[in-house]
Amino acid sequence: MTEDNAEGQETALSSQNLVSVEITLPKDVSGASKPLTVKMAESDTISDLTSTLGLLSSMRDLTNYYVFYRNTNISETFDELCPISEVISALRVESQPNVKLELRHKPYTLAAVYEHLNKFREVIGLHFIDRRAFELGELSGVGKFDQLQLSQVPDQKEDEKEKVDLGEDDKASISSICDRILDETKLDLSEYGKFYDIYSDLQVPIKSLTISQWSPVSPKEAVRGDLLYLTLQTLENDTYHITCHLSGFFVNSCSTVNFNPARKPSHEPKFLFFDLVSSLSPAFAKTIARNEEILANSSRYAESYLIPSHTSGSYPWLVDTSAISRKPDQSRPQLSILNNGVDGSDNVKDWNEDFQAIRELPSGTVNERILRERLAIKLVSEFTKQATETAVNIIKGNLTPMNPNESVEQHIYMRNGIFYSSGVNATGAFDETGGNEAARYAAAKDLAGVKLLNRIDAKGIYHLATCVVDYMGRRIVCQAPVPGILNDPIVESDEAPADKVCYGLSTDGTKVYSDSQFHEALKPIAEAFHMKPHKVTLPNGFKTKEDIALSKDSKGIRGTDGRNYVIDLYRSTPLDIDFIEKHWRPEHSDSYPHRETVLRHEAVEEWWRRRALAIFKSETERLEAEQGAKKNEGESEKPQILLDAQKVSFNPDAFTHDEVDEEDKEVVREMSLFVTKQLIEEFVEESKKQLCPFDGSHLSSLLHKAGINLRYLGLIATRAQESLEAFEQEEKSKIEDNEKAIEEEKKEEKTEKKEEKEEKADEEKSENEEDKTKPEEPSKGVFDPIKANLNSVRLLAIQEMIARAVKHIFRSFAHTLSSYLLPYFVAHFHNCLLGSQVSSKPEISIDETLTAFADPDALRFITLDHQQVVSMVEEEVLLRFRFELPENWINAVSPITMMREISHKFGIQWKTQGYAFTAEGFKEFQQSTENIIVHKQKSSKKSKKRSSPSVEEVFKRKTIFVADDIISFTPSVKSSSYKATLLDEIFEAARGKIAAEEKDSGVTLLNELVSIYEQIYGVVHPETSNFYSVLSQFYSDLGFTTEASEVARKACVLFERTAGFDSFETISSYINSAYFEAANSSYVNAFKLYEKALGDWDFVFGSHHPSSVTTLTNLAEILAQLKITDKANRLFSAALELSEKINGEDSQITAMIHYRFAGTLVNENRFDEALGHFEKAHTTFSRHIDPNDRLTKDCSNYVANLKTYIAYMKQQAKDKNKPKKVKAPPVPPQATTKKSKNKSKMAQTQISKLHLNSSTRFSSSSRVKPRLKKK
């Protein structure tokens, strides 16, 4: 974004004129005695005003009203999208402090009653309970943040001292946290999977509310104003029949068997349904108040329980069944009546028309862009939700296809304006490139192209709302179809139907169409994708006369609405030809599954950037040389550089069996090699010093951002191993060179005379005293956990390959399994894969009532055993990732970690319990899960009066997993939702202001941005979470420690709910939040957050994550500063033990921990132990860095001085304990005491300096710096 644009965004946001609007409520509304006052921008619309009013507590029940200015009905006179400024101008509102408006009751219609009843359900809290009832899994959006019970963030005052004295209670709390951190037996899944679900504590304030059996209203009563009849049962068990009238609500005289719509005089009518129920049930208002109190007390952050508006919550892979609660509600099955409108058509949407209409909205001003982006994100969210629910029903077999006579994979559906297909090779387009596997891959790449088009926002060309749903092993592609594409054209019997494709490859694949209107509209997209206009020659000899902008496989279709649509964007990046030529051999059994392997958009963008930069640099040098020659000749014209787009673009149809220029092929080959030769090499190199990924999802995310496809996971693992071996060899050579240098120094020291040594020491002392003012030379040590990082990346890559291979195996079995047999298969497969220590041939028992409906071929999984499953995984990994798993790989991976990874990949929710994977642990697990089933024996008719005898049967599991352990399967949804470009522009403007030292303006923009994020995405959304994380970092850098802590806490809550309670985003946010809490001197809070992060690491990765070493060491130093020395020493010891395990005992990082630990021990006057650690550090530093490095010299000095000091103290103690003699010979003072006292004094001086000399830190910080996602 240019500087002018940045200034424009700031001006647009800061210069909005605010209008104070005073609202007078109807007299019968609670709180109507005082007018309401709200602040609105002049650019806000009437719709914005009504939305704002709906958020006010006093307006929460009022849904049906007119807005009046004096006697002018604004609601009827002006459009709801009319800006307030136009209303003020049109009505000639007098200039006064407030614009005075009045709300008046509007007569109800049946549609308004439906809306009012829906609002009533929301007000009394039923929407919380409805959300749980209609979820596609269990306990979505739960978290653990509130379980930490953090104290309130203190206000940090400027004059507050940095030193904080903790009370004994706080020290005891921190000590107990440290004990839990150091507890090696803390891996307990039965506790790890427990959550507090706020909604489970809420009580329904009424017993039931249903549409009465007397509905619909008869024409006779409708004439009198009756709209609907309801039946209400209160908590007092009283039943009321209620009439919804145009004037409001009242109790009628109906009963269950008699119809009498007359009003009961004993009950007053009310305009608001809430007021009527409150008058009928005293417990109603009390229950609502109690529910509100529960929500308020459960968390200080409303983000913990607010319902996500534009996204879905994350489903946990572990589910505590005790937290699952079901609240009865007879009106819930009738919600479709209320939501679908009077004629049932409100839920039927023309998604495509709505989507395109929003894209056509004006976007000239900031407010217009905010409105447009908000509506677009909202619509995409609603589309994805609707599509996901329908896709799940399709997979479960609940819906009838349009083509029921074809195979299941070929079935297509058209439901509620959305077209559904199975993402298979239905048209035969991928017959030669992999069939169904290629079609499945292409569906995901098409979606990636749609997401990019959403951001590009090209004019004159349209694309489709799209999402992809994976559920129980099947994929459903959901799209809002092009208008008219499903209509069959009317043709004569002897004529072929007209092709609906106007641009690109024809439906039958025999020709390529061109169209000037499409071509011009597609040019901006081609430029954004860096595609080269090109001609196409098909294998059948057909040649295009004109260039086409995109790949020939991307089709242009003109809809019946007159809009031009582009579809099939799966080839918007070039083929990965290097990978294809090496691994696509369809005639071989070990061939890669398909040939549709394309590069990622991130890789193309990076290739384009580097190539353009190289061309620009070359041209600059050439023009500068020419300019220099012209200056000599007297010419001074400034050169201009124009970048030829042809030099930095590619032909997307290269290597697609079409005839293409060799030059175009070479460019695509260069791009393919760019990934393997540069991006992967750079990724492995950066992995040495960057924060190591936390889990497979984190690794996958990093690879995608780097432009690396996951098919290269095998190459990543291989290169990590090779890089590790090279590093170890380099270290070995360095050690040999340093050891030679040490030996040479020792020889030189032996040849020196004692007098020369003392003279040299005096000279060095004087030199040191002279050089005190000189800056200290930094150490050459490298304290990145290179060995641990490379090992971890390799392990994570292998784990990710295994988990993804298992997902593909599940998918292959799921095609023949019904939904009710899938839990048995998944549980059995897990027993075979992870339970070999319990049984290599696990048993499986399936209910006969289920097997009776199953195809015998579908039950082939029953015979699987451990060795077969291991072989299947090895073959799948080799097939998809070109990597041979090492021997005994199953023993190298953590069962819990693998169970979690597979659960995330396939969408499995397991019952929370202490799964055990060893023979010893399984025996305890068996006992803890024993169930006693009571069977009652049948009694004869003669003995009916006698009680039937019962028989107890003990169910004892024989395997780790059983089908009942699977709580649910959840869908994995790939949406076309995107990051609004406006937000990036405002953020860059704010960052520019801060960088330019305009702190106040920058912070104001950031605060405005918080509001805009919540407007566009809603409060509970991954993008909002990410921005909170970035904002907390900015606040911290600006010195706003209190604000940083508050915002970081919200980021933790939101990431837990949207990304997962143990996702890498959540763990990172906890680490950052802990850092900010410590910076704010809230050490108890910081340690609670660190404990949660470290605990998650243990489950997600294992206790040996490279960053755990840094975290433990930093915590130890914090404890040392807080004078909690015993726990500090234990954490230092734990960090040392872990570092020796993952970095090596003889490594720079381990030596640095010795160095820091020694400094802490000196502070505790534990000189003997400190000496031992300094000696170890000195040995390692001299061997790995340099004998003359600053750290090596420092350690040498500390060792020498500590030895001298310890010897002196021992001598002092010895002299003190000597018995006094009567006579002592006179001793010359200078002959015996001066030298020893000087040495002791020097040693004490050096030791006192050591207290301040433990500031060297690892370059790989345990704190994760949040960054905005690259798009």
From Swiss-Prot:
Compositionally biased region (Basic and acidic residues): 729-763
Keywords: Cytoplasm, Repeat, TPR repeat
Gene Ontology CC annotations of this record: cytoplasm
GO molecular function annotation: mRNA binding
Keyword 4Fe-4S attached: no
InterPro entries per the UniProt record, alphabetical: CLU-central (IPR033646), CLU_dom (IPR025697), CLU_N (IPR028275), CLU_prot (IPR027523), GSKIP_dom_sf (IPR023231), TPR-like_helical_dom_sf (IPR011990)
One family name in Pfam for this protein: eIF3_p135
Record keyword Cytoplasm present: yes
Lineage: superkingdom: Eukaryota
Residue ranges of the region described as Disordered: 729-783, 1212-1271
Subcellular location(s) of the protein: Cytoplasm
Disulfide pattern: none
Polar residues: compositionally biased ranges: 1241-1253
Domain Clu: 329-580
UniProt xrefs under CDD domains: CLU-central
Residue ranges, compositional bias (Low complexity): 1254-1263
TPR repeat placement: 104-138, 502-535, 1067-1100, 1109-1142, 1151-1184
Subunit structure as annotated in this protein's UniProt entry: May associate with the eukaryotic translation initiation factor 3 (eIF-3) complex.
Family designation: Belongs to the CLU family.
Function of the protein: mRNA-binding protein involved in proper cytoplasmic distribution of mitochondria.
The protein, known as: Clustered mitochondria protein homolog
